[in-house]
UniProtKB/Swiss-Prot annotation:
GO terms for cellular component: cytosol. This is Trans-aconitate 3-methyltransferase. The keyword Acetylation applies. GO terms for biological process: cellular response to amino acid starvation; methylation. It is found in: Cytoplasm. The gene is TMT1. Belongs to the methyltransferase superfamily. Tam family. Induction: During amino acid starvation. Present with 937 molecules/cell in log phase SD medium. It comes from Saccharomyces cerevisiae (strain ATCC 204508 / S288c). The modification N-acetylserine is found at residue 2. One of its GO terms (molecular function) is trans-aconitate 3-methyltransferase activity.
Amino acid sequence: MSTFSASDFNSERYSSSRPSYPSDFYKMIDEYHDGERKLLVDVGCGPGTATLQMAQELKPFEQIIGSDLSATMIKTAEVIKEGSPDTYKNVSFKISSSDDFKFLGADSVDKQKIDMITAVECAHWFDFEKFQRSAYANLRKDGTIAIWGYADPIFPDYPEFDDLMIEVPYGKQGLGPYWEQPGRSRLRNMLKDSHLDPELFHDIQVSYFCAEDVRDKVKLHQHTKKPLLIRKQVTLVEFADYVRTWSAYHQWKQDPKNKDKEDVADWFIKESLRRRPELSTNTKIEVVWNTFYKLGKRV
């Protein structure tokens, strides 16, 4: 994804403004995984959000490697790691594409040496078939592949903001034309058209969660599989900073025709306060995301 590789992309803001993942989700992955825990590779790791979380949340792996095609993202991940060297002593980062495991070395690449491969908030940019076949070539028998992501948040307590949550990212006068496709459409669809191949993986588990279900306790408890529930308390200013981490926002800012236009993220704050004047820019409100996950074990 070229935007995230741009030298002027703010990877520090990306790291600080994106949501993290709940402990109970990592516990579920721990319970799902069978066998050894020598090596975990987190592809498309970005600034190491999930990579570094897994180093703390999962039962220990001897080695964790985060890989990403963006040198900008990897640099940020390494800076964060260096801030807590003892905590992340088993973590390293490599510049590499999602389907390229050459960084393992000639004696290990395509030799079924990996115990777990994760792809977090990134698989919509991949050639999914190429990725899963490369994962198959590098995972040991019964090794875990875990793919998850999120998109299109809502403010559950403020349904009057729902149309804003469509207008800001997808409005034709705003960011809509600036998303790289088909990646964004795949993510909006929660990768429902990308399937783990049952000839390559078994014990496949898939879950989709609609953020609006948090408004309906009946629907929330009807999920047959435990959903990935990503929720966060944010101020309007913090949410605007999250908007600024979107690749479409970066592209919008780069377009000269938008030079004199009102900033989309600033407009979101202004419009939110107009609709709910009792709020301030520093009022904490809950945001919840649509999510999905796909788990499998190598045959």
